[in-house]
Design a protein with these regions (language model features):
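Aromatic- and Gly/Pro-enriched helix-to-coil junctions and flexible linker segments
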Residues: 1-193
Length: 193
C-alpha cells in the first residue's frame, strides 16, 4: 500500500522486530542518556604521524595552501589510516579554523568546496568516531612514501600561486578553474595514484 500511496517515497525506514526485553533494554539506555562506549584516543604513533602530515598541509605559502585544498577536496570522504603493523584507528581529513596544536574547530559545510567563512583554513585529522559501514568505507593509507609523492607532485614543480582562488560557488565548483595553476601532470598523477 505504501508503494502505491507514495510511488517516489523510496524504501521505508524500519527495524526488525525486537522482543519486549530488548525494547526495554534500549529504552532504559536512552533514559540513561544513551551513552556510547569510550573510544580510545589516537595512539602515540598515530599522533606523531598526524603531526607530520598536518605540518605539511598547513604551511603558510600559497603554493602549499592551494595544494592542501586540492588534496582535501579529493580526500574528504576517505577513512585515513597510518601505516603500521596493526592499524587501530581511522581519521577524516577535515577543515578547521584552528591550527595544529589546538583543539579542532570543525568547519561544517555541505560540500568540500563551500565557503569556509574564515580567513585561513587549516587541514586537520580528526579521529573517526562513527560506525564504519562497508558501503561508505574508503580506506586510504598514508605513509612517508605518500608524503614524499605529494611533495614531488605539488610542491617541487616550478609554478607560482599569486592568490588563493575564490570560494564563490560558481568558481569553486569548477575544479578546472579553481586549480588551474597546479600543473596538469601533477593533478593527473595524483588522480592515478
Amino acid at each position: 500500500r505504501l508503494a502505491s500511496d507514495q510511488p517516489h517515497g523510496g524504501m521505508p525506514y524500519g527495524l526488525p522486530g525486537v522482543s519486549r526485553e530488548e525494547f526495554n533494554h534500549l529504552q532504559n539506555w536512552l533514559k540513561g542518556g544513551g551513552k556510547m562506549s569510550h573510544i580510545q584516543p589516537p595512539s602515540k604513533y598515530d599522533q606523531n604521524k598526524i603531526a607530520g602530515w598536518e605540518a605539511f598541509l598547513n604551511q603558510d605559502s600559497l603554493k602549499y595552501q592551494l595544494s592542501a585544498r586540492y588534496i582535501y577536496e579529493h580526500w574528504f570522504l576517505a577513512h585515513i589510516y597510518f601505516t603500521s603493523e596493526n592499524p587501530q584507528s581511522f581519521f577524516k581529513l577535515v577543515r578547521s579554523s584552528t591550527p595544529p596544536g589546538e583543539e579542532i574547530k570543525l568547519i561544517n559545510t555541505r560540500r568540500p568546496y563551500d565557503d569556509p567563512k574564515v580567513s585561513r583554513v587549516y587541514y586537520r585529522f580528526m579521529q573517526e568516531r562513527t560506525t564504519i559501514l562497508s558501503k561508505t568505507h574508503l580506506p586510504l593509507e598514508l605513509n612517508e612514501a605518500k608524503l614524499l609523492r605529494l611533495y614531488e607532485q605539488f610542491i617541487a614543480p616550478d609554478y607560482t600561486v599569486t592568490k588563493m582562488p575564490s570560494y564563490e560557488a560558481k568558481a569553486a565548483s569548477n575544479p578546472f578553474k579553481t586549480f588551474e595553476v597546479i600543473p596538469i601532470n601533477s593533478k593527473y598523477q595524483f588522480m592515478l595514484d
